A protein has these predicted regions:
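Phosphate-binding and adjacent anionic-ligand microenvironments
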Residues: 12-211
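Cysteine protease catalytic core and zymogen-processing segment of caspase-like enzymes
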Residues: 1-11
Length: 211
């Protein structure tokens, strides 16, 4: 909501950054306004690195950490809350209505995450299995794997048959990321429907546990 509003009404300069596990809708918003978007590892420290070396309008991560370079190279929840309140006042809409407008313009994007508290042995074995899945002749949750990205964890881009015939259908992806400090694996997914996301998260849970 903030990115779309700033680009549409403020025209502030700079690129945009986003973490590896955040929505691809941001890419579509940037494409509309001719802005470059940088995808980086998970953690706000990567946003800071960009802000200290390049002209960055804003950057963010999945946990809600959003920063504006013209303000300071750090997250500021108070600023973001004030900006959102201003957007709602100017547009005369609730936050839910603003999100619905984005879904209409850029396609429905549904997102989910689960945390698995599992031991290091199971966690590491699951990541190792994910890394060797082949592209083309492998499927996940009934969806062909079309691309794999290992920037931070293992991320599968999938050919979701549910997206066929849908205008601006969200790209379907699934990310498995093992914590380096805890016996924990986080699993993220985004797709064009809540049902697809739920199915992928359930399949990923079974995969991580050895199913």
């Amino acid at each position: 909501v903030l990115l779309s509003w700033v680009l549409k009404h403020k025209g502030w300069p700079g690129d945009v950054t986003r973490a590896f596990n955040t929505t691809k809708m941001l890419d579509r918003i940037c494409a509309k306004y001719g802005r470059k978007i940088h995808e980086h590892g998970i953690g706000f420290k990567y946003v800071v690195d960009y802000m200290l070396t390049q002209e960055i309008l804003m950057g963010g991560e999945e946990s809600g950490g959003i920063g504006f370079q013209r303000h300071l190279p750090e997250r500021d929840g108070m600023l973001n809350a004030l900006l959102l309140a201003n957007v709602m006042a100017e547009e005369g809409k609730t936050l839910g209505q603003l999100v619905a407008d984005l879904q209409t313009e850029y396609g429905e994007h549904q997102y989910g995450r689960i945390d698995l508290h599992i031991g290091d042995e199971i966690k590491n074995r699951a990541i190792a299995r994910a890394r060797v899945l082949e592209i083309g002749d492998k499927v996940f949750a009934g969806m062909p794997i079309v691309r794999v990205d290992m920037l931070d964890g293992v991320k599968f881009y999938l050919d979701n048959p549910e997206a066929e015939g849908r205008q601006n259908a969200a790209e379907t992806w699934l990310l498995l990321r093992a914590s380096g400090t805890e016996p924990l694996m986080r699993i993220y997914s985004e797709s064009c429907s809540k049902e697809s996301v739920a199915r992928l998260l359930q399949a990923a849970r079974a995969f991580a546990l050895g199913g």
